[in-house]
Curated annotation (Swiss-Prot):
Similarity field: Belongs to the archaeal Rpo3/eukaryotic RPB3 RNA polymerase subunit family.
The keyword Nucleotidyltransferase is assigned to this record: yes
Cofactor: [3Fe-4S] cluster
Catalytic activity: RNA(n) + a ribonucleoside 5'-triphosphate = RNA(n+1) + diphosphate
InterPro entries from the UniProt entry: 4Fe4S_Fe-S-bd, 4Fe4S_Fe_S_CS, DNA-dir_RNA_pol_30-40kDasu_CS, DNA-dir_RNA_pol_insert, DNA-dir_RNA_pol_RpoA/D/Rpb3, RBP11-like, RNAP_Rpo3/Rpb3/RPAC1, RNApol_insert_sf
Lineage per the UniProt record: Archaea, Methanobacteriati, Methanobacteriota, Stenosarchaea group, Methanomicrobia
Keywords: 3Fe-4S, Cytoplasm, DNA-directed RNA polymerase, Iron, Iron-sulfur, Metal-binding, Nucleotidyltransferase, Transcription, Transferase
One Pfam family of this chain: RNA_pol_A_bac
UniProt-recorded name of the protein: DNA-directed RNA polymerase subunit Rpo3
Subunit structure: Part of the RNA polymerase complex.
Biological process annotations from GO: DNA-templated transcription
Binding positions ([3Fe-4S] cluster): C205, C208, C211
SMART domains: RPOLD (SM00662)
GO molecular function terms noted in the UniProt entry: 3 iron, 4 sulfur cluster binding; DNA binding; DNA-directed RNA polymerase activity; metal ion binding; oxidoreductase activity; protein dimerization activity
Amino acid sequence: MTMEVDILELSDRSAKFVLSNVSTAFANGIRRAMVADVPTLAIEYVNLYDNTSVLYDEQLALRLSLIPLATDIETYLPQAECDVCGGEGCPACEVSLTLSAEGPGTVYSRDLISSDPKIQPADPNVPIVELKKGQKLVLEAIAHMGYGRDSVKWQAGVACGYKNMPVITIENCDACGHCAAECPKGIISVEEAGAKIAEEDIMKCSICRLCEQVCDINAIKVDFYENSFVFTMESDGSYTAKDLVLNAANVIKGKAEEMLAILDQL
């Protein structure tokens, strides 16, 4: 059977879609790739030339490393995989960002000046530190490509999960209303003819089966499709939601091609 994708919601940072005719292992592979295997840019080193703020150098470096950066996966390579410099650092695998600020005022992520105009903080209003009168902050930050499996700062997918597509059947209901009262999602309504669930609300079901447990006549049954999954994901801004899913799929494709190449040599 051919894999099917039905997009339910899509914005720059989040998406919700139904992935059908795939195994649980494949669905989990997509989720894991979005979280751990799609490389992103994040600040790795910070050279502090002047810091008279209330924060220690190490605290500033940590805050800077956790600021998501818009990533161009076509231009930059993870440093360990860079053929240009052999992992020493070069324009093909790293980006320089500078910052110079003097108080009074709050320093924000938008104050970082990138050597590559395409690489900017995904959120311009992330506060870094508040400077009082006379305090200064001058630094250079070096951003590298990396993987979420190595550090959370390189994790592009911040909220990626899936569940099996629910299947709910209602037969011979006596309209007692117990199932509707027990449903934590509030998706069951009761009419004179019996309990009812709107088609668009079925995906909200968490498959807790509380409605089954309170039904004395076993009129309602909750199950799920084993090969259909409802995905919900959010990006940290390194990529758009669409690009993150596509890059995750390409990661899985690349691994499969590598395995086939190895098997062909046997």
